[in-house]
Amino acid sequence: MSAPPVTERALVLRIAASGESFHKIDILTAESGTFLCLKRLSKNRSQSTDPDLFDTADIQLDTSKQGTARFVKDYQLVHRHSAIGQSYRKLQHASDFCALIAQNGPHMADPAALYHITERTLDAFAERALPAIVFLKAIYILLKDEGYPVREAWWPELPATLRQSAKQLIYPPTPNSATPEQLEACAQISRNLCRWLRRETDLILPNSLA
């Protein structure tokens, strides 16, 4: 006998086709963390029932009798981050961040904290004009929240020429404008931080960042 359906508020991290009848959806909930579920493609598709990347939705889930798969029984859209899809750079950076969460979330200790960070990050991607800076801040905050010594170990390794820029980019609220020099510094700092993450942590970078 299968377990009774449960409803959880979820963030949609990734969507991929699974045959002709289903979507594979990586979601994150504050209660259960990240996991993969399947949603049957509806013949009467509508904007509110068809999942989209970065959605916030109330999802009712059925577990298979074998307990190995979870299926979406009902999908109620709460909020759609439509602005992310209107910018290639926003879409790229948000997809990279969500792929990182989807791949590593099952091994992270506090799903509620992870949900909060991811929700705030998606809001920032949608609302702010500089997704590269949002991405840098999000990776730094994620590492710090997971207990990795970014301040103690990564910061001293960062080239001295980039430290002042890093302070200006990471700590204040994300600005809506930046000079070309600031954006180039942001790209260098992000690459440096991702190299440190790959070398010094047990997190797995998605292929797009490796």
Regions found by a protein language model. Name each.
Residues M1-H23, L28-A210:
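Non-catalytic alpha-helical scaffolds and adjoining flexible linkers that form interface surfaces
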